[in-house]
Amino acid sequence: MIPVASRASTIEYAIRDVVVPATKLEAEGHQIIKLNIGDPIAYPGLPTPPHMVQAYIEGLAQGNNGYSPSYGLPELRDAISKDEASKGWDCTNDDVYVCHGVTEALQIIFAATLEEGTKVLAPGPHYPPYMAYPQMYGASTIEYALKSDDGWAIDLDDIES
């Protein structure tokens, strides 16, 4: 068996860590709704919208099913940069890097910005990778509270403490 790297053995990943106890509870007869992975197909009430199915079919028929450029399709990067610019951001196509999802985006951002010993502030409640991924790069995460009764505003007193 290949040994696990020491840095990997300390990483907690709450999205998947809940699967074992949830499966045990299901075996005991409890009804569990699994929202931890974000798989919309797992829920019959959330079918893929017809226009998306049609776009997929058309893309396959046109042969648009291979690898895209590393930074993303130029048309998509253009649409994203225009949308961000319309919100007041100084954004051009060169500022846009299209990722396969938030997981990849977070890993790229953390790899590019974190050094050993860096401390990262993350809001709570949070998306579990905010806590787990910095550990991969030798950083640590400090969770701070959000005020649910105040539109999820940052609790500055909690950060200061």
Which stretches of residues belong to each language-model region?
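PLP-dependent aminotransferase-like
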Residues: 111-161
